[in-house]
């Protein structure tokens, strides 16, 4: 059998195996060593191919696409540093629990570690940041090779999509020549199915948890960012049964489209009210129940650490014990819909006055936040008004740093159906533009990106993807000329070197970038302009709204809001 036929059979078996296990999307970056597999992907009707020349941005694009679809997305690149450029997004996918199938083309084994060009040590390149890694055989025509491909790709996708989701790495060596014969049909498959099952809690664990909850006098629940594809109906029913205060982080997506009968239990202003020592003294808990990831607010976590409740129970699909407080007493590793159906709640011991204290504080803080958005002119007020302007049925991708914190502060419970997403696995500001672009590709809802100026600059390369596929996205850039979050941190009290090291102003404006990428552009200088300018930017698929704010005014206005709420809670 010829080398060309061996290679053709090999790569089409790979593509057929991916299609067999439900892969629909592949993000490809150009390169020579990945030629055979890239040709096979491009010629397969069952696969949608996306292109991005920058591998770092390509990986974040794939991350966003996987977030939107809750399905595994394949990344394909050539050998060498191309594969290394995937690393930041792989780290984020690992901690954010996003399924990626990373395929790195490689030199054949005889060219490794001998100084061959564009060759690095690629097997197991990503270390502990992938759930599984395997080095594939060459397309040598040996009888075991094609069955190996079928089973290992099925295994890779099963691992990536088992709880917790995460990335896997397939390193695939190709020997020259690299051209194949293009095929119209995929080969027949012999391996049919691979599944990893669900995480079901033990009966004893559920009995113990039921006992803890039913004996609690004072307790609250926290819902953080949840696993992709989580059905919120289970959680809403649990809220109705539990009847406790429920602290809902914005990324839980339980602040929007809220069922009316669940509204009395929701606490959305927890970050503001947790700054009050008087309020914290009133609501010392016996029990804290946390579902999903740790919330954005450090103040609620500091409160738990300091109070050390008798029971701090974490229920999560991730077995890595995500508890930075160090005071958890129970960890239950299970799928959310599984543990809920096993609980028996009576609530006989719970004190309704405890819920009333949370309700009173939340209502007070909500009133001040509503007033703030009407009278202030800073970034927070801008965000609050944008949340009212963005139409029902939209999704908002939010950058780390100040945007995600402002969403957490200013998003109150609403009947509007708006969902929020972010890269909070490792909380970085890198790759956010690309992630949002990928997210918009996998999403049939209108999509917005809320981002700061430095995070936008960090991933301007991500916009290259818009030259290869039409992207429907409105980018809202809060341009405060630097790193606004540091103004809230102790570093801001030391004037020497502050601007050089932390403020890092660039004095850049983004109209020329918008022009370069054929984006609709509007500039907003004042809050009075916001409504009219925002509604006017609808002409092109890709839109940029640049909103100018002042870092010093932002931090002053935020602190005045917190001080007003604190003073009222003290009274």
Swiss-Prot record:
Pfam families according to UniProt: TPP_enzyme_C, TPP_enzyme_M_2, TPP_enzyme_N
EC annotation from Swiss-Prot or TrEMBL: 2.2.1.9
GO biological process: menaquinone biosynthetic process
Cofactor(s) recorded in Swiss-Prot or TrEMBL: Mg(2+); Mn(2+); thiamine diphosphate
Enzymatic reactions: isochorismate + 2-oxoglutarate + H(+) = 5-enolpyruvoyl-6-hydroxy-2-succinyl-cyclohex-3-ene-1-carboxylate + CO2
Domain of life: Bacteria
Cofactor annotation remark: Binds 1 thiamine pyrophosphate per subunit.
Pathway(s) this gene product operates in, as recorded in its UniProt entry: Quinol/quinone metabolism; 1,4-dihydroxy-2-naphthoate biosynthesis; 1,4-dihydroxy-2-naphthoate from chorismate: step 2/7; Quinol/quinone metabolism; menaquinone biosynthesis
InterPro entries tied to this protein: DHS-like_NAD/FAD-binding_dom, MenaQ_synth_MenD, MenD_middle, THDP-binding, Thiamin_PyroP_enz_TPP-bd_dom, TPP_enzyme_TPP-bd
UniProt keywords, alphabetically: Magnesium, Manganese, Menaquinone biosynthesis, Metal-binding, Thiamine pyrophosphate, Transferase
Single Gene Ontology MF annotation: magnesium ion binding
The family this protein is said to belong to: Belongs to the TPP enzyme family. MenD subfamily.
Role played: Catalyzes the thiamine diphosphate-dependent decarboxylation of 2-oxoglutarate and the subsequent addition of the resulting succinic semialdehyde-thiamine pyrophosphate anion to isochorismate to yield 2-succinyl-5-enolpyruvyl-6-hydroxy-3-cyclohexene-1-carboxylate (SEPHCHC).
Subunit structure as annotated in this protein's UniProt entry: Homodimer.
PANTHER family named in the record: 2-SUCCINYL-5-ENOLPYRUVYL-6-HYDROXY-3-CYCLOHEXENE-1-CARBOXYLATE SYNTHASE, PROTEIN PHYLLO, CHLOROPLASTIC
Designated name of the protein: 2-succinyl-5-enolpyruvyl-6-hydroxy-3-cyclohexene-1-carboxylate synthase
Gene giving rise to this polypeptide: menD
